[in-house]
Curated annotation (Swiss-Prot):
Residues annotated for Zn(2+) 2 binding in this entry: 236, 239, 257, 262
Organism of derivation: Homo sapiens (Human)
The protein's assembly and partners: Interacts with H2A.
Effect of residue 372 to S: Abolishes ability to deubiquitinate histone H2A. No decrease of total H2AK15ub levels following ionizing radiation
Gene: USP51
Protein name: Ubiquitin carboxyl-terminal hydrolase 51
């Protein structure tokens, strides 16, 4: 009789499975048949359990008889029944290989249950002996945990000695995480050998020595000398900071920020793939984009750290720290300072730090390449009170189609930057760029003249400030009310007197500065002594005493005989006659700039005049006015337009030139407050004394009217 199997189907499907190959039967026959089926099923179960228990003891393994085939029929709700082909029962036979690590589990046989028809009560099945309990299955083998990559440094022993490969998929099996490779490594001791870039680095020469030096000097710095060296040297070569996770390149001398990606840019540019973290000593691979572990590198770091700790705890101080740093770890007896001396490093020093000389508006300027001539002029301009008030109050109205090319707008930004309160030096690259655009003769990184730059920047500012004059220049071209003309423009009167009829021809020209000849120049010394025209003129030439600024002004305003070779046509006598010329100041500017002419050309030779010129802190310009000259001609009467103290000036800036014509440097002295002077050398600003100021050589002198000054 065929074995009965029951397969559960979804409810409501209308299909039921019946074992055997017959059709319908009477109820009595069905009950009798069900009882026999129960007895057969119980016997088959008992025999099967006994046979499987015997098979487990057999050596070698024997084959199990195949299970009998059965024909299954299905019947639908319509009463049609069809016979399905017999399907062998799938089970683990003895012919299939069994895993040698575990014993085969006994497969329980399906129990036959009687399916009674509705309305019939089946008799209870006869009692059967319970089958013996199957042996307990062995516990499942522990499944190895997949290793998750970590950005921390691996410790020896806590993880496999070799990490996953850089690419992650060794055999191209589609396992980018490298889990299969790692399982091979754990089970059979195979798998990846670590970062290939580290292996390539280890092929090079002296890599161990260089790595030890990096760990010794910049990572495990335990002595005061190494800490000082690390504080001075370990700064980013791009942003000059040491707070953004510094890394050191293992292929060259370069420190870069990891947070700001400066070390990444270096690695990409130089193709240097490895760097060491200077705080933890771990190695980062830029190709793998992860921290990598290497047994040899880890051993070097461990030995270096233990060496330094052993030297720190040693009590011997016979060997100096310098020997330790240069020994290369070959001298095992080298020691350094004891740990007991370290608390002395944190004790306050007896000497106090110098008080900062910082004041608002006093800010250094970066030299962009032979731009010291520009920096000193900018320092002088930014300390003019009226000019400062104009730019800080944003009174400029730009009418240019491209405001980025307006020099007045850039000067406004420069004033705001100088008076922003920042102590870091300012970089005036935009100002330099605009000067190159609007004054092409100053373009380039050649050495330039500070006086020439002053005239150029005033001219460009004047042209870009025409709209600020309120339209007065459109009505009168000779009258401009821009901020540059209000501050710097003065009136220079030239009187030419005919020697025949004594008629005077007067001309008044605007001027932004006054250029003064010096004793020792070609304009002042005797032309009959050509041997005096050497490359350098001493301070004692021509004048027995020390010449002063007042002497130069008197020479500038003296009557000058033009001679027979420079005859001019007189408007009165209508003939060419010899004449005399005298220059005086018709109008005094608010800021008077005096240019001492220290550079001159003698034929094909250029030279610098080093004659010392003394200059006062306060200057009275009354003797050099045109009204003073007229009053002298009227028998000593006081000037008609002279007001007491109106013509007095105070010195507030001095620009000096150091060196020769071919190679020189410009610096400046700036008065920040009354009697407080500072020396400005590009980005370096130091406090200066009045003696330092007055004993300087002087090239450009800036004076401000006392009545309009603001201390």
């Amino acid at each position: 009789m065929a074995q009965v199997r029951e397969t559960s189907l979804p409810s409501g499907s209308g299909v039921r499975w019946i074992s055997g190959g017959g059709g319908g039967a009477s109820p009595e026959e069905a009950v009798e048949k069900a009882g026999k089926m129960e007895e057969a099923a119980a016997g088959a179960t008992k025999a099967s359990s006994r046979r499987e228990a015997e098979e487990m003891k057999l050596e070698p393994l024997q084959e199990r008889e195949p299970a009998p085939e059965e024909n299954l029929t299905w019947s639908s709700s319509g009463g049609d029944e069809k016979v399905l082909p017999s399907i062998p029962l799938r089970c683990h036979s003895s012919s299939s290989p069994v895993c040698p690590r575990r014993k085969p589990r006994p497969r329980p046989q399906p129990r036959a249950r009687s399916r009674s028809q509705p309305g019939l009560s089946a008799p209870p099945p006869p009692p059967a002996r319970p089958p013996p309990p199957p042996p307990p299955p062995p516990p499942p083998a522990p499944r190895p945990r997949a290793w998750r990559g970590s950005r921390r440094r691996s410790r020896p022993g806590s993880r496999p000695q070799t990490r996953r490969s850089c690419s992650g998929d060794l055999d191209g099996s589609g396992d980018p995480g490298g889990l299969g490779d790692w399982l091979l490594e754990v089970e059979f001791g195979q798998g990846p050998t670590g970062c290939s870039h580290v292996e390539s680095f280890k092929v090079g020469k002296n890599w161990q020595k260089n790595l030890r030096l990096i760990y010794q000097r910049f990572v495990w710095s335990g002595t005061p000398e190494t800490r000082k060296r690390k504080a001075k040297s370990c700064i980013c070569h791009v942003c000059s900071t040491h707070m953004n996770r510094l890394h050191s390149c293992l292929s060259c001398v370069f420190f870069g920020c990891f947070t700001e990606k400066h070390i990444h840019k270096h690695a990409e540019t130089k193709q240097h793939h490895l760097a060491v973290d200077l705080y933890h000593g771990v190695i980062y691979c830029f190709m793998c984009k992860d921290y990598v572990y290497d047994k040899d590198i880890e051993q070097i770091a461990k030995e270096t750290k233990e060496k330094i700790l052993r030297l720190l705890t040693s009590t011997s101080t016979d060997v100096s720290h310098q020997q330790f740093m240069t020994s290369g770890f070959e001298d095992k007896q080298s020691t350094c300072e004891t740990k007991e001396q370290e608390p002395k490093l944190v004790k306050p020093k007896k000497k106090r730090r110098k008080k900062s000389v910082y004041t608002v508006g006093l800010r250094g300027l970066i030299n962009l390449g032979n731009t010291c001539f520009m920096n000193c002029i900018v320092q002088a301009l930014t300390h003019i009170p009226l000019l400062k008030d104009f730019f800080l109050s944003d009174k400029h109205k730009c009418i240019m189609t491209s405001p980025s090319l307006c020099l007045v707008c850039e000067m406004s930004s420069l004033f705001h930057a100088m008076y922003s309160g920042s102590r870091t030096p300012h970089i005036p690259y935009k100002l330099l760029h605009l000067i190159w655009i609007h004054a092409e003769h100053l373009a380039g990184y050649r050495q330039q003249d500070a006086h020439e730059f002053l005239i150029a920047i005033l001219d460009v500012l004047h042209r870009h400030s025409k709209d600020d004059s309120g339209g007065q220049e459109a009505n009168n071209p000779n009258c401009c009310n821009c901020i540059i003309d209000q501050i710097f423009t003065g009136g220079l009167q030239s009187d030419v007197t005919c020697q025949a009829c004594h008629s005077v021809s007067t001309t008044i020209d605007p001027c932004w500065d006054i250029s003064l000849d010096l004793p020792g120049s070609c304009a002042t010394f005797d032309s009959q002594n050509p041997e005096r025209a050497d490359s350098t003129v001493s301070r004692d030439d021509h004048i027995p005493g020390i010449p002063s600024l007042t002497d130069c002004l008197q020479w500038f305003t003296r009557p000058e005989h033009l001679g027979s070779s420079a005859k001019i046509k007189c408007n009165s006598c209508q003939s060419y006659q010899e004449s005399t010329k005298q220059l005086t100041m018709k109008k005094l500017p608010i800021v008077a700039c005096f240019h001492l002419k220290r550079f001159e050309h003698v034929g094909k030779q250029r030279r610098k005049i080093n004659t010392f010129i003394s200059f006062p802190l306060e200057l009275d310009m009354t003797p050099f006015l045109a009204s003073t000259k007229e009053s002298r001609m009227k028998e000593g009467q006081p000037p008609t337009d002279c007001v007491p103290n109106e013509n007095k000036y105070s010195l507030f800036a001095v620009i000096n030139h150091h060196g020769t014509l071919e190679s020189g440097h410009y610096t400046s002295f700036i008065r920040q407050q009354k009697d407080q002077w500072f020396s400005c050398d590009d980005a370096i600003i130091t406090k200066a004394t009045i003696e330092d100021l007055l004993y300087s050589e002087g090239y450009l002198l800036f004076y401000h009217k006392q009545g309009l000054e603001k201390d």
